Amino acid sequence: MAPPMTNCLTFSLSPMEMLKSTDQSHFSSSYDDSSTPYLIDNFYAFKEEAEIEAAAASMADSTTLSTFFDHSQTQIPKLEDFLGDSFVRYSDNQTETQDSSSLTPFYDPRHRTVAEGVTGFFSDHHQPDFKTINSGPEIFDDSTTSNIGGTHLSSHVVESSTTAKLGFNGDCTTTGGVLSLGVNNTSDQPLSCNNGERGGNSNKKKTVSKKETSDDSKKKIVETLGQRTSIYRGVTRHRWTGRYEAHLWDNSCRREGQARKGRQVYLGGYDKEDRAARAYDLAALKYWGSTATTNFPVSSYSKELEEMNHMTKQEFIASLRRKSSGFSRGASIYRGVTRHHQQGRWQARIGRVAGNKDLYLGTFATEEEAAEAYDIAAIKFRGINAVTNFEMNRYDIEAVMNSSLPVGGAAAKRHKLKLALESPSSSSSDHNLQQQQLLPSSSPSDQNPNSIPCGIPFEPSVLYYHQNFFQHYPLVSDSTIQAPMNQAEFFLWPNQSY
């Protein structure tokens, strides 16, 4: 039986041959069947001359290797186990030809030039460049020393119990099957110690994949570049809401600090794509006439062409926006008006005014009141160019612009009441003037006591009660005392409050 397996690799000085015995297995292993261990023979490296002499002296003095450096005799030593255990034990009756096939270049004085330039691998484990020497059965002569520095690798892998893998990659044409050892500390991929064919292949694969990905990205950019979100002119699809918006570029004006002449005119948002396209057509016909490029035939807008002749550009654009569903989403025909989902009342709000947020204007009983509140807030924040639900002449623009915040439902109601109270105040002042003209304007000395009204004029600011009313009797003599006035001469103002 062969000795038990260990995790060490055996490096011997004998040729790599196996016993041709069928009844005994020399490569019994506890590893996986797919990974077959191999013996490595004659693994040496070149060193400098100073290091060679020191290594030779140390090896000559050592008790383990003293038998190999016998200068008086050229006897070739027999097989030794440097690590205390081996995979294969060779028979002692090997021929001298086999024993001397690989050891002759190192122990024969005729080949001392090679022996002086070569030392064992275990003398220095930090040798950076690993060199291999042919271990075939042919004689190693001086003519083959020039090829010692070349590295020939065979396609084998030696696995140990650890995660390190030893890679032997390359092609070998010699009969001896020369191997070169390389150690990889990673657990996934073996290290290849060849001329870089595998690394080159991986680099080629990486470059190919990079080129493919870059080509795909370029194709995507080319495909998405210049794509329109709608088949109609002047219509775009909103990326978040999925609704369609219509815009018109007005190149008849230039804003301050703007490089390109013109401005974008918003025509409203629409639930259907064709409605947005028709809104663009109408705006284009209003701006540029019948020469404008439209989405649909101009003959289909005969009725709208008659209506737009009586309106200015701003008025017509405002009417287009009112017909859109950009704000109401079908809940109300008025802009900025929606129905409360719990109360059922109409609420108004305006967007993008308070730090790019919506401003809530309150709830109202009718749609018209909510629409008026929105109009007042729009005029306050956006001036005369604001898009309102009703005509501008319905509101006092100067009063709205000078009003203070907040602009909400209560402020809109107060403003509406203020406008309504202006006319009743003027009529009440005229009524007071008429009452003063009815009073007598004669002097008190010439005044007839009977002509003095028996009452106190009513003033709305002061309330009078019954005890404040009295009859006026002049201070005269008893002979001239007259009878009290009749009931018809006593006056009371009808605007009393009790």
From Swiss-Prot:
Residues 186-220, 422-452 are annotated as: Disordered. GO terms for molecular function: DNA binding; DNA-binding transcription factor activity. The keyword Transcription applies. Residues 209-220 have a biased composition (Basic and acidic residues). Interacts with HDG2, and possibly with HDG3, HDG7, ANL2, ATML1 and PDF2. The keyword Transcription applies. SUPFAM superfamilies: DNA-binding domain (SSF54171). GO terms for biological process: callus formation; ethylene-activated signaling pathway; lateral root formation; leaf phyllotactic patterning; maintenance of shoot apical meristem identity; phyllotactic patterning. Belongs to the AP2/ERF transcription factor family. AP2 subfamily. The lineage of its organism: Eukaryota, Viridiplantae, Streptophyta, Embryophyta, Tracheophyta. Expressed in roots, seedlings, inflorescence, and siliques. Also detected at low levels in leaves. Probably acts as a transcriptional activator. Binds to the GCC-box pathogenesis-related promoter element. May be involved in the regulation of gene expression by stress factors and by components of stress signal transduction pathways. PROSITE patterns: AP2_ERF. Keywords: Activator, DNA-binding, Ethylene signaling pathway, Nucleus, Repeat, Transcription, Transcription regulation. It is found in: Nucleus. Residues 231-297, 333-391 bind DNA. It comes from the Eukaryota. It holds the Pfam family AP2. Residues 186-195 have a biased composition (Polar residues). Gene3D superfamilies: AP2/ERF domain. Its main location: nucleus. This is AP2-like ethylene-responsive transcription factor AIL7. One of its GO terms (cellular component) is nucleus. Residues 422-451 have a biased composition (Low complexity).
